[in-house]
Amino acid sequence: MGANVLIMAGGTGGHVFPALACAREFQARGYTVHWLGTPRGIENELVPAAGLELHRINASGLRGKGKLSLLKAPLMLLKSVWQARAIMRRLKPVCVVGFGGYVTGPGGLAAKLAGVPVIVHEQNAVAGTANRLLVPFAARVCEAFPDTFTLSDSRRTTGNPVRSELFLETSRPALAGRKARLLILGGSLGAEPLNKLLPEALAQVAADLRPEVFHQAGKNHDEVTAERYRAAGVDAQVQPFIKDMAQAYGWADLVVCRAGA
């Protein structure tokens, strides 16, 4: 067993999938990878399925919360940092790598207090709150897009880690004699503009020219999106989340998606 590395990422696929790609690279180099997340995010499904050990702390955001929650916030942050610190005492990681999500803030602070090097990776052009707060403490700051962290002397523009299975060549039948295949992606949480506008737009395409549709609508948005397709008279396969994205990419001729990691 190699030295331990602790990945911190949670909440959405935009944080978790690049972190999974990074985790695989650490494993290929002989490290043992552990994961720090929360009890509620998508990491609870994806990380154990990837064969990685998931450790959880109680961490959440403050947006949209009431005054009582804001008053409790300092105490909750201290509790989250203490939980993360206890995990790090046990694992003794050689470094922690934060990809964003609520878990990254207290996890990164705990690592700094423990003297563990912190690496930050930001997947988007505009950095999230947790990653921005960790930049002053980070030994290395990685950005997918140039100039996301213009004030950091330790920044490196690395791009986004991509899982190796997405590079596998796939064969699909020629378009002649079949309908085109359209994949619609709004992220793991969905994108309401795509969920609302695509059924309306596809209804205006002649039925004999209309593509096959596979639509990732996001958690809690799949039923209403499927109903929109039915009301528009458009056949579509709608799912809240696509687990096998490599297969979906291999199936599709065209992808409509929103920006994001």
Model regions and ranges:
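Conserved nucleotide-sugar phosphate-binding/catalytic loop shared by glycosyltransferases and other
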Residues: N4-G10, R29-K79, K219-H221
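Short amphipathic alpha-helix
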Residues: H15-F26
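Active-site-proximal region of nucleotide-activated glycan assembly enzymes
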Residues: T32, I42, E53, K112-S171
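Donor-nucleotide binding loops and adjacent catalytic segments primarily
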Residues: G41, L46, A50, S171-C257
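Glycine-rich, highly charged phosphate/nucleotide-binding loops
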Residues: K72-I87, Q239-K243, R258
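Glycosyltransferases and closely related glycan-assembly transferases
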Residues: Q83-V97, T104-I119, R132-P136
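Short glycine-/small-residue-rich Rossmann-like dinucleotide-binding loops
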Residues: G100-G101, P146, G187, G218, ...
